[in-house]
């Protein structure tokens, strides 16, 4: 009969009628070693009669696999009526706590049955869902009405059998946790592991997981276990989807599931991906997979809930900076293979951090009057070590899992802002001081400046430290007559001009400090304008104009260029040919480039000729020096200048 129901859907109605009349109720108690019963009345199982034993044997021998498959196929039937009747049979004859399911069937068969049962939620039919919850959460039972029931020893109803396994403080949530939680989670994970390319099949476990959240007793336990597997499955499908339409269909289901999950759980998992020991450099493949998953999650799913923006994203930014610092300061940089893995991880961390900084609003770092903390607490926060900060973040998310309401964040809004700036500045310093970190300098300065723009009220620890590091790097190179890499010089120019141009710029860098470094920077940039060195011409010219944009009224860059062009070894005030050729490069790129974009910081009320004055303040004196070569230079030099003038456009706007 079981086989007929499994293999022939048309016979399931008849099989159901037979089962309703002849299937024994398999709701006996669990064997004594699993019973949690203070009275111990049922520990020996004396009430199992010979008739019940015979009935059980008749449907479960030689093994109960056929019984399970009969129910599984019935629960997956296309007809709602058949699904409903099989669910009724589960509730009345084969509850989750029955010894058949808990003792006699294999774990795979139990997963099969539970997976088939929860599959009915796809239909969104309330009558099916009610029966499913009754089966997963156990039958209702009023303990007081059965406390003195003398007949309970001889005939255990499914209600009393269920409650015999619990103490007086048991609940439906405990029932599900003990009997249904593990097989349900395993079943959903098995569905996710199938890696189907069909959009309908792929999204099925997502929709099931979403529907399970309708009951907190089930969803509250299952969702934390399947959340990351669902997101990983979605990430994998993006690479194997046959078309964008297929991925969009699957992503809609994944996105609906994601939107139903608590923000604290989402970010608890994200922080775990970054800070957890399982994602350490000792397991590089796992670490990179976790970082890529975090990137996918943050770039594809909705991250704009207020709690996410103001509480969780700042903590995640801080977690990323802590991870980057740990990778950079590791003693393993010189070990084979470490630097390449760490560099890839740092690139991924940088892209995620920049994505988050674009998302987070300024109000996330603005103190709230109703949540104000004592300034001494903020001072204590900013003096915490990285290990203490990491522990505080992990403890916060650990507590959030055990609480219905979000606990108090580990840091105030200004406190977390200050620590973020401290760590971001520390990473910039590492790039300046370490030869192995130079490649990340520009990216880290970009991030640091972007963070400063979002944290206007935060205090930067040791604000002069970054300027001092840049100054030392540049002056050491100039004193040693060495040329720094373009990435370092470019980053230094960007850092100085950006820090000076932020609101309340005097907090970070003064105009006097910039003027002190302009001659050194111009000297470095001028070497990149060699005619043969085509690679860096555009970048060097852009940097010179960027320096000019913050100092143009005082002609500082113009004076520095003029000084570099005039050879100190001669008494002549004319530029030699090699310096003139560098000026030709600067002039050409100044003419063809949009140099006006660097004048955005100039006042708009200085009259109609402001652009002309702005340009002239950089190019005039060096141009006069070059033109002087027409009369006082050597024949070759004069010829070179004439050729350059001849090739110039007839007008220069």
For each of these PLM feature ranges, what is it?
Residues 1-653:
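Structural marker for long, regular alpha helices in very large eukaryotic proteins
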């Amino acid at each position: 009969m079981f086989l007929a129901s499994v293999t022939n859907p048309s016979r399931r109605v008849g099989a159901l009628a037979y089962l309703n009349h002849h299937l024994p109720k398999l709701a006996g108690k669990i064997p004594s070693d699993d019973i949690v019963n203070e009275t111990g009345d049922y520990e020996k199982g004396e009430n199992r009669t010979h008739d019940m034993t015979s009935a059980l044997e008749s449907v479960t021998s030689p093994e109960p696999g056929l019984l399970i498959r009969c129910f599984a196929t019935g629960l997956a039937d296309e007809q709602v009526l058949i699904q409903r009747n099989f669910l009724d049979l589960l509730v009345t004859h084969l509850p989750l706590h029955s010894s058949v399911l808990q003792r006699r069937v294999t774990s795979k068969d139990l997963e099969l049955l539970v997976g088939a049962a929860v599959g009915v939620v796809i239909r969104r039919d309330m009558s099916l869902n009610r029966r499913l919850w009754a089966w997963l959460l156990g039958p209702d039972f009023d303990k007081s009405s059965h406390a003195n029931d003398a007949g309970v020893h001889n005939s255990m109803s499914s209600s009393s059998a269920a409650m015999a396994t619990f103490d007086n403080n048991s609940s439906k949530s405990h029932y599900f946790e003990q009997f249904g939680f593990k097989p349900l989670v395993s079943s959903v994970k098995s569905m996710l592991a199938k890696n189907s390319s069909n959009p309908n099949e792929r999204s099925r476990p997502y929709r099931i997981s979403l529907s399970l959240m309708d009951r907190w007793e089930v969803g509250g336990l299952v969702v934390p276990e399947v959340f990351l597997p669902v997101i990983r499955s979605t990430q994998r499908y993006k690479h194997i989807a046959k078309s964008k339409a297929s991925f969009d269909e699957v992503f809609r289901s994944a996105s609906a599931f994601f939107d139903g999950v608590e923000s604290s759980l989402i970010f608890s998992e994200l922080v775990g991906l970054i800070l957890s020991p399982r994602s350490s450099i000792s397991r590089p493949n796992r670490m990179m997979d976790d970082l890529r998953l975090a990137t996918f999650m943050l770039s594809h799913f909705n991250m704009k809930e207020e709690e996410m923006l103001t509480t969780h994203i700042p903590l995640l930014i801080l977690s990323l900076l802590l991870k980057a610092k740990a990778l950079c300061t590791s003693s393993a940089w010189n070990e084979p293979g470490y630097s390449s893995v760490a560099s890839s991880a740092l690139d991924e961390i940088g892209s995620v951090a920049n994505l988050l900084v674009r998302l987070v609003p300024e109000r996330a770092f603005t103190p709230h009057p109703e949540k104000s903390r004592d300034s001494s607490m903020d001072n204590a926060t900013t003096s915490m070590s990285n290990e203490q900060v990491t522990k505080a973040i992990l403890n916060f998310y650990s507590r959030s899992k055990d609480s219905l309401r979000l606990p108090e964040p580990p840091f105030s809004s200004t406190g977390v802002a200050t620590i973020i700036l401290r760590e971001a500045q520390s990473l910039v310093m590492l790039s300046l001081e370490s030869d192995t970190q130079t490649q990340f300098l520009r990216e880290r300065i970009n991030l640091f400046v972007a963070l400063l723009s979002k944290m206007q009220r935060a205090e930067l620890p040791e604000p002069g430290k970054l300027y001092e590091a840049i100054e030392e790097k540049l002056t050491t190179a100039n004193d040693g007559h060495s040329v720094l890499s373009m990435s370092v010089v470019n980053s230094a120019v960007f850092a100085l001009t950006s820090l000076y141009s932020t609101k309340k710029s005097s907090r970070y860098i003064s105009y006097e400090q910039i003027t002190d470094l302009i001659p050194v920077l111009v000297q470095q940039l001028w070497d990149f304008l060699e005619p043969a060195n085509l690679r860096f011409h555009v970048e060097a010219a852009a940097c010179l104009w960027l320096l000019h944009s913050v100092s143009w009224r005082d002609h500082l860059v113009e004076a520095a260029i003029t000084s570099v062009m005039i050879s100190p070894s001669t008494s002549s005030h004319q530029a030699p040919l090699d310096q003139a050729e560098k000026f030709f490069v600067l002039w050409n790129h100044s003419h063809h480039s949009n140099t006006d974009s660097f004048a955005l910081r100039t006042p708009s009320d200085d009259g109609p000729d402001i652009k002309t004055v702005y340009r002239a303040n950089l190019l005039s004196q060096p141009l006069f020096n070059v033109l002087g070569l027409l009369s006082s230079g050597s024949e070759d030099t004069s010829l070179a200048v004439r050729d350059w003038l001849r090739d110039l456009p007839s007008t220069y706007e």
